[in-house]
Amino acid sequence: MLFDVFQQYPAAMPVLATVGGLIIGSFLNVVIWRYPIMLRQQMAEFHGEMPSVQSKISLALPRSHCPHCQQTIRIRDNIPLLSWLMLKGRCRDCQAKISKRYPLVELLTALAFLLASLVWPESGWALAVMILSAWLIAASVIDLDHQWLPDVFTQGVLWTGLIAAWAQQSPLTLQDAVTGVLVGFIAFYSLRWIAGIVLRKEALGMGDVLLFAALGSWVGPLSLPNVALIASCCGLIYAVITKRGTTTLPFGPCLSLGGIATIYLQALF
């Protein structure tokens, strides 16, 4: 029935996808900020350090607030993208600057959802790619902040890809998706092991290995070299622009871009 509506009103799906992307992007900002804190609290509890009830946070509580003045953000000031523009990037109460990251994450998510709806109209694969985009955006920003890819995001990428293949919404068969995961894991784990011996230091984090393997469920074994090539080029460009030299490079965003780019290249060519 829903697809019948989209057929009758072809502009409806891109509009809904864009609005949905803005809303999901707003939620991703919460996840990006709070999830690492939640894990640190869990680790503290594991070691016997009990945080106070007031300081303990979840994805739902406490309500979003300004990190500078601690004032709870009003509903009218929490509209994705629009509120940041209307407030000119400042807190209504203390006038402290609001990071540009918040509208950028919301805008990027909206654009990712819009693009998927345009490339795969009236398709379950479009929804799957939207979900993938959300996983990758959150994982990439956390990796940029903390140089760490949480397992929950790489597992989300993995299971979403496998479920899409199982439900026959993916261009891949379930067998190809599983093979892609196995080949991706073996290839990148071997590369990690060899690079560790040659360089005598960890060249790839285990999170990078797991993310590459998870992307195999989306692109299949034959397209994994494309993911690695695009990711390597992105990593090189990022290192040159930021002048990081031999310092640790967060590779998750590069792999994410390589995976998404490969999925769209498969669709277009």
From Swiss-Prot:
Q: Which GO terms describe its cellular component?
A: plasma membrane
Q: Phenotype when inactivated?
A: No effect on assembly of T2SS-beta, severely reduced secretion of the labile toxin exported by T2SS-beta.
From what superkingdom does this record's organism come? Bacteria
Pfam families for this protein: A24_N_bact, Peptidase_A24
Predominant subcellular localization, coarse grouping: membrane
EC number from the UniProt entry:
2.1.1.-, 3.4.23.43
The record's GO molecular-function terms, alphabetically, read: aspartic-type endopeptidase activity; methyltransferase activity
* Record keywords: Cell inner membrane, Cell membrane, Hydrolase, Membrane, Methyltransferase, Multifunctional enzyme, Protease, Transferase, Transmembrane, Transmembrane helix
The residues that cross the membrane are: 13-33, 102-122, 124-144, 147-167, 178-198, 210-230, 249-269
Q: Could you tell me the membrane topology recorded for this protein?
A: Multi-pass membrane protein
Question: Which compartments is it annotated to reside in?
Answer: Cell inner membrane
Could you state one GO biological process linked to this protein? signal peptide processing
Q: Which reaction does it catalyse?
A: Typically cleaves a -Gly-|-Phe- bond to release an N-terminal, basic peptide of 5-8 residues from type IV prepilin, and then N-methylates the new N-terminal amino group, the methyl donor being S-adenosyl-L-methionine
Q: What does this protein do?
A: Cleaves type-4 fimbrial leader sequence and methylates the N-terminal (generally Phe) residue.
Family assignment?
Belongs to the peptidase A24 family.
Anything else of interest in the record? Encoded in a type II secretion system (T2SS-beta); this strain encodes 2 T2SS but only this one (beta) is expressed under standard laboratory conditions.
UniProt xrefs under PANTHER family: PREPILIN LEADER PEPTIDASE_N-METHYLTRANSFERASE-RELATED, TYPE 4 PREPILIN-LIKE PROTEINS LEADER PEPTIDE-PROCESSING ENZYME
What's the protein called, per UniProt?
Type 4 prepilin-like proteins leader peptide-processing enzyme
